[in-house]
Amino acid sequence: MTEEIHYVKADPSGNTTILVLDAVPKQEHASLAARLLQPECVGAEQVGFLTWPDKEADVRLDMMGGEFCGNASRSAAAYLLSRSGQDHGEYRVSCSGCNKILKAVVVRDEGELYDASIEVPLPRKMDIVSLTDNDITYRFYQIELPGIMHFVHFTPSIKTIDKNA
């Protein structure tokens, strides 16, 4: 039996995200996400589930691991703008791993491209981490957000990034 799932695949800053548009029981999120993430299915790095609350937020995003994700939240807001037919908009986004409503601002760039920004919760913790490889020391910022940890490395130019590493 084939199950039909409506979804949008977004690519916010290279962080490919599947946003499931249908109501899916929470206990089925993990198994559905595992299927959708497979390259032979849709393929992406992560899955979020959208719901439409009737309260303070315009959209609710529940990530497959219960974490907060700024890129997926921006994508949810961009999806709302795409449905509105407008060229710009402000949206209130609720996301797992975050206990406040976040304001997102989205502008249609061209076609199906969007420029979206969103408030992010304050980190629980931030540290500086240094790693040395081939006598070169790299400095990273370790940023702990609710449900997820990021390592951020600033580079003088995107051209200096080894995309095959």
Where are these regions (language model features)?
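Surface-exposed beta-loop interaction hotspot
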Residues: 118-161
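A glycine-rich beta-to-alpha transition motif near the start of alpha/beta enzyme domains, typified by
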Residues: 1-114, 144, 150-165
